[in-house]
């Protein structure tokens, strides 16, 4: 049992911190090996990830006298406090100086890197070097710190904290639920797959809000309805009630979201954590899905066009409304892949120097033509996937209209039933589907036809540019 056991997750980080604590407690062993204690430890990462908690556990595990410095005074008094903290730690060595939220020590103006607060910290670190004083600092954004402060020699060991992984999140949720009354209806897999893992603090807040909701309703325990409602509200800004709209509008929204979901599941099976028709901060028109597994840029582009493809396939001759964000997302995915990875060939890579911020006119014309061609191709793939998964699409749409929100277990149950009726296809199978029927590609070699189409688009764009 050690002080770090109270921190859930971060196994690799805790091992590294335990090693440093062992060095502080048993310097002679390491010195005999010719190893010296690193100069300083800097923990950094987004707010709420547990940097301060880990630093406090480090202090507790080390057992050394510790002086904590955080910005709680005016500038002059604070600078004096920094100097006094290092001087006091030096007289009580071996000891620790903890600089909490060090990136907030100075104002965030253009000259904050040269602020006297950071100069005082640097002077203090240099003054206690090799005196038995160990310095720990936490920061949200180390880019706000002077490079001279965060360099090796002042902070030899830098540890960046990331948002919890899926397994970390499940461990954190399980830990916090131990202190709460929980109904048997809570499905841990559904819960972890629908949540975003932004920080440990956010996960704790969500579980507490679920407990508040259950207590207010005078329930005997937190149930899945409480969990889902709080996650949708806290993480997605979703309203609890559907807006008053016609059945036809609800059905179209459901079909649109089902299109995204089915394409996503076909390309990346088991990737959709949940789907909902409720309006959210990100989509005030209503409807969104959460993918709990990462997709490639090309897959993301196809998924983004799935909603439009579903509606326009069902309502032939109609152009789906409210798809501008989806199209913009698909375009961005195509451009990212083309610019960074050369997915459309080297001719579309911007190889100009970084000092030139504007893309050349010729390159821009070629890029726009290629993006348009790729949009058509990916739209065709989305329609092909939906045609192959017609039963799955129909049943997801009906379930969304009825339940408004589908969890991971709901989606997989529907998928399992649909597969028995009409086996769902994978991305590879979709590429063999008769895209010729949609895009007039020769069925024997659709990829070559696509390349020829892109070349014709590029030639047409070049002719327009030169005319």
Label for each model-derived stretch:
Residues 46, 250-254, 261-467:
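Soluble catalytic regions of large protease machineries
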Residues 103, 258-260:
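Short active-site segment of divalent metal-dependent hydrolases/proteases
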């Amino acid at each position: 049992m050690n002080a770090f056991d109270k921190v859930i997750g971060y196994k690799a980080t805790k091992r590294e911190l335990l090693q440093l604590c062992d060095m502080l407690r048993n310097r002679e062993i390491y010195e005999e090996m010719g190893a010296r204690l690193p100069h300083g430890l800097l923990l950094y990462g987004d707010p709420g990830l547990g940097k301060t908690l880990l630093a406090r556990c480090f202090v507790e595990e080390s057992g050394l006298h510790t002086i904590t410095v955080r910005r709680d005074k005016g500038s002059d008094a604070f600078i004096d406090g920094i100097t006094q903290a290092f001087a006091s730690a030096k007289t009580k060595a071996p000891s620790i100086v903890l600089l909490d939220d060090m990136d907030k020590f100075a104002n965030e103006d253009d000259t904050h890197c040269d602020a006297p607060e950071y100069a005082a910290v640097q002077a203090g670190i240099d003054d206690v070097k090799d005196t038995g004083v160990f310095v720990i600092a936490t920061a949200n954004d180390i880019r706000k710190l002077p490079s001279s402060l965060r360099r090796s020699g002042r902070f030899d060991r830098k540890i960046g904290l990331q948002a919890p992984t899926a397994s970390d999140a499940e461990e954190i949720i399980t830990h916090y639920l131990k202190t709460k009354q929980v109904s048997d209806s809570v499905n841990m897999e559904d819960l972890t797959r629908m949540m975003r893992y932004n920080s440990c603090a956010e996960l704790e807040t969500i579980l507490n809000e679920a407990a508040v909701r259950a207590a207010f309703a005078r329930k005997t325990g937190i149930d899945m309805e409480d969990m889902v409602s709080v996650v949708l509200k806290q993480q997605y800004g979703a309203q609890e009630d559907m807006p008053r709209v016609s059945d036809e509008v609800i059905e179209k929204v459901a079909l649109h979201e089902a299109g995204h979901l089915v394409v996503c599941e076909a390309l990346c099976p088991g990737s959709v954590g949940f789907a909902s028709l409720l309006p959210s901060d990100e989509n005030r028109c209503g409807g969104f899905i959460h993918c709990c597994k990462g997709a490639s840029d090309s897959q993301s582009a196809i998924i983004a066009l799935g909603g439009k493809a579903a509606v326009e396939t069902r309502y032939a001759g109609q152009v789906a409304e409210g798809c501008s964000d989806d199209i913009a997302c698909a375009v961005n995915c195509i451009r990212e892949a083309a610019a960074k990875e050369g997915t459309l060939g080297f001719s579309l890579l911007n190889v100009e120097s970084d000092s030139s911020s504007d893309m050349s006119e010729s390159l821009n014309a070629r890029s726009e033509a290629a993006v348009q061609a790729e949009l058509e191709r990916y739209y065709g793939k989305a329609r092909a996937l939906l045609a192959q998964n017609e039963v799955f699409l129909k049943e997801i749409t009906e379930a969304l209209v009825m339940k408004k929100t589908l969890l991971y277990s709901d989606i997989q149950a529907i998928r399992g039933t649909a597969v028995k009726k009409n086996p769902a296809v994978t991305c590879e199978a979709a590429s063999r589907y008769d895209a010729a029927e949609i895009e007039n590609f020769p069925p024997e070699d659709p990829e070559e036809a696509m390349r020829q189409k892109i070349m014709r688009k590029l030639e047409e764009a070049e002719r327009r540019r030169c005319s």
